[in-house]
A protein has these predicted regions:
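N-terminal leader/targeting segments and the immediate start of mature chains
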Residues: 1-2, 9-13
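Charged, gly/pro-rich active-site loop segments
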Residues: 2-6, 83-189, 229-331
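Short amphipathic alpha-helical segments and helix-helix/interface helices
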Residues: 12-13, 63, 131, 191
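Short loop/turn motifs at secondary-structure junctions and domain boundaries
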Residues: 14-19, 192-197
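Short beta-strand segments
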Residues: 20-58, 74-78, 84, 88, ...
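Short, solvent-exposed aromatic-acidic interface loops
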Residues: 55-60, 279-283
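A short, hydrophobic beta-strand micro-motif
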Residues: 69-74, 241-244
Length: 331
């Protein structure tokens, strides 16, 4: 953990401990950012200045990128179906440490937290076998929080209250990719898929290397991409690689739907931008808790089997063994 743990407010702590679904962003080797949704289950250690979430070996690319560059950000952007009451938008930036082999006690703690947020888990001989990898082959991602920014409303308008290092200046404009900045996927088709997903967040790499995640509205589209609106002061000028997330979820996280994009962001003003998507990935869970649990179990079993067969698990464990005290890889 950090030498001097960051201490955050009671309001922020309620949000960190109570949100059902948050956005997690990590940086890419090309200087962009990817943003996805996770359920952190209120995993916080306030005294240590640490937050976290768990994930599966079934998502190795996310883990590998975090292991190679541990600078991450978590955006607590909605109170829907959670336990927190404040209407603050909270952005936590920090350094991740990946625990590839959590202790049995840590895994038991996750199960207890899961019961609180997702409802009592399935049990019985068949379910225990099916969900073994989903429950016991988890990977812990701990984040030592370096900076926390809090806005007084979920739309993130106005100046933030910053705990930790001062908010950095806007990052420099990036060089356009060799293949150009225009959309590489069907914008009209993707727009129709995004329409039912109410939560939209944009992520880019900040000037100090940590991801910045901001809420945006998608207010239109044309041949150049999606037209975005953002609160004043949160869009960096110029063009750059960026990630976009659109997602939705129901109580106990049933029926989770998520679309993630990588692409090129061009700011047109302090509040308006064009986002040209280059890649897209979709995930949708069935709106039935039993069917979703069945799918989780099958996917986790397959992910663990595949990670063992193709060497992914060993490669990730090797990278994890090279982590420094703040997640930095040791040379």
């Amino acid at each position: 953990m950090t030498a001097t743990p960051l201490h955050w407010s009671d309001t922020a702590h309620e949000v960190l401990s109570g949100d059902l679904n948050v956005a997690v962003a990590y940086v890419t080797p090309a200087g962009g950012a990817v943003v996805v949704s996770v359920s952190p289950l209120g995993l916080t250690d306030r005294a240590a200045g640490r937050i976290g979430f768990t994930t599966s070996l079934g998502f190795p690319r996310k883990l590998e990128r975090i292991l190679r560059d541990p600078r991450v950000a978590l955006a607590y952007h909605t109170r829907e179906h959670g336990f927190a009451r404040p209407e603050d938008y909270v952005l936590a930036q920090g350094d991740a440490v990946v625990d590839m082999r959590p202790s049995p006690q840590r895994l038991d703690d996750v199960l207890d937290a899961s019961d609180r947020f997702f409802g009592p888990g399935k049990s019985g001989r068949a379910w225990d076998w099916l969900l073994h990898e989903y429950r016991r082959a988890r990977v812990y991602v701990d984040i030592d929080v370096r900076r926390m920014a809090t806005w007084p409303d979920l739309a993130a308008y106005g100046p933030p209250e910053v705990t930790g290092p001062a908010w950095p200046d806007a990052p420099a404009e990036q060089r356009a990719p060799e293949n150009g900045t225009a959309p590489r996927v069907d914008v009209a088709r993707l727009s129709r898929k995004i329409d039912p997903l109410p939560y939209r967040l944009l992520a880019y790499r900040g000037a100090d290397g940590y991801p910045v995640v901001v809420p945006v509205e998608i207010v239109g589209r044309d041949h150049t991409g999606f037209r975005l609106l953002s609160p004043p002061g949160l869009l960096p000028p110029g063009g750059r690689r960026a990630g976009l997330l659109a997602h939705s979820f129901r109580p106990q996280n049933v029926g989770l739907a998520m679309m993630t994009f990588t692409g090129w962001l061009t700011a047109r003003s302090e509040t308006e931008a064009c986002y040209a998507p280059h890649t897209s990935t979709a995930l949708a869970a069935p709106p039935n808790r039993t069917v979703q649990a069945l799918g989780n179990g099958i996917l986790a079993k397959h992910g663990v089997w595949r990670a063992g067969r193709d060497g992914t698990g060993e490669r990730l464990r090797t990278l994890a063994g090279q982590q420094g005290p703040l997640g930095r890889r040791e040379s």
